[in-house]
Swiss-Prot record:
The gene is ribH. This is 6,7-dimethyl-8-ribityllumazine synthase. Disulfide bonds: none annotated. It comes from Sodalis glossinidius (strain morsitans). 5-amino-6-(D-ribitylamino)uracil binds at residues 22, 57-59, 81-83, 114. It catalyses: (2S)-2-hydroxy-3-oxobutyl phosphate + 5-amino-6-(D-ribitylamino)uracil = 6,7-dimethyl-8-(1-D-ribityl)lumazine + phosphate + 2 H2O + H(+). Belongs to the DMRL synthase family. It comes from the Bacteria. The lineage of its organism: Bacteria, Pseudomonadati, Pseudomonadota, Gammaproteobacteria, Enterobacterales. The active site is at residue 89. Forms an icosahedral capsid composed of 60 subunits, arranged as a dodecamer of pentamers. CDD domains: Lumazine_synthase-I. Pathway: Cofactor biosynthesis; riboflavin biosynthesis; riboflavin from 2-hydroxy-3-oxobutyl phosphate and 5-amino-6-(D-ribitylamino)uracil: step 1/2.
Length: 156
């Protein structure tokens, strides 16, 4: 039986991080976690990391699509936070963001790591951005690196 698994050390990986400005006080922590994981655990060089800011989570799929189409990156990490409010806006933004990012990954055959928090409250978002529940930005970055290696192994 053949088993394909990836490792997270990828010193030559070229990684883009697309991040939403909306809810920046939470997203900044996601970004810090992602960059730290890429550099410290993944051993990715600073010059191989590109950060692209967009207005909100809804705009992430378009930016990630452009990054994928550029062929300049081995993976893209999408970071943002969508917090439920009193209207249906949450469902629309979270759903379109998630399905849009998934569609880009499948179309471009490029790892697109989902680091977009979809929470019921600000407190839950803060917990997932580096306090009680770890840092989902770091987790997404490591997922991207592992998927780079998995796809390389599949193609080998």
């Amino acid at each position: 039986m053949n088993v394909i698994e990836g490792v997270v050390a990828a010193p030559d990986a070229r990684v883009a991080i697309a991040i939403a400005r909306f809810n920046h006080f939470i997203n900044d922590s996601l970004l810090n976690g992602a960059v730290d994981a890429l550099k410290r655990i993944g051993q990715v060089k600073d010059e191989n990391i590109t950060v692209v800011w967009v207005p909100g989570a809804y705009e992430l799929p378009l930016a990630v699509s452009a990054l994928a189409d550029s062929k300049n990156y081995d993976a893209v990490v999408a970071l943002g936070t969508v917090i439920r409010g009193g209207t249906a806006h949450f469902e629309f933004v979270a759903g379109e963001c998630s399905s849009g990012l998934s569609a880009v990954a499948a179309r471009a055959a490029l790892p697109v790591a989902f680091g977009v928090l979809t929470t019921e409250s600000i407190e839950q978002a803060i917990e997932r951005a580096g306090t009680k529940a770890g840092n989902k930005g770091a987790e997404a970055a490591l997922t991207a690196l592992e998927m780079i290696k998995v796809l390389q192994a599949i193609k080998a």
